[in-house]
Amino acid sequence: MSVDRLYRNLMNKLINANIDLDAYLQLRKAKGYMSVSENDHLRDNLFELCHEMHQHAPRLQHAVAAEEKEALRLAGEAVASAAVCLLSGHHDCPSYIAVDVDKLESCLAVLRLNIHKLNDSQPITHA
């Protein structure tokens, strides 16, 4: 896979993670809780994206500008923080999850900001 294609693929996955996290938060606010399966599904997807970003980072490292590299790093941190936040919450009731909505909203805001930065940046150059 070319570096351009890899970059676009990761960008699309970050955008999808943003959409999924936003939808999760809206449902969480409306219902007041989330089921274990809903929580685990999102958490697993976020951890999978973290793994993929970490796996492809060396290939992208020399192909992107410093600003893009920093935005990718911060977006990855936001995804990882959201996934870790979703690890907690089984304590109150084994069937439902009570996550820290403020932490998830903070992760979503950082992710959204860095997606915008990446979308506004110039196309990457080939290494």
Residue positions per predicted region:
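Leucine-rich amphipathic alpha-helices with coiled-coil/heptad-repeat character
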Residues: L21, R28, L60, V64-E67, ...
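Short, solvent-exposed, charged loop/turn and helix-capping segments
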Residues: E48-R73
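Amphipathic alpha-helical binding modules
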Residues: G76-A127
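Amphipathic, well-ordered alpha-helical segments in soluble domains
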Residues: K13, A17-D20, N45, L49-H56, ...
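Short, charged, amphipathic alpha-helical segments
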Residues: R8, V36-F47, K69-E77, S95-S106
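Short terminal alpha-helical segments
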Residues: M1-L46, L108
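Charged, low-complexity interaction regions
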Residues: Q26-S37, Q61-A66, L87-A98
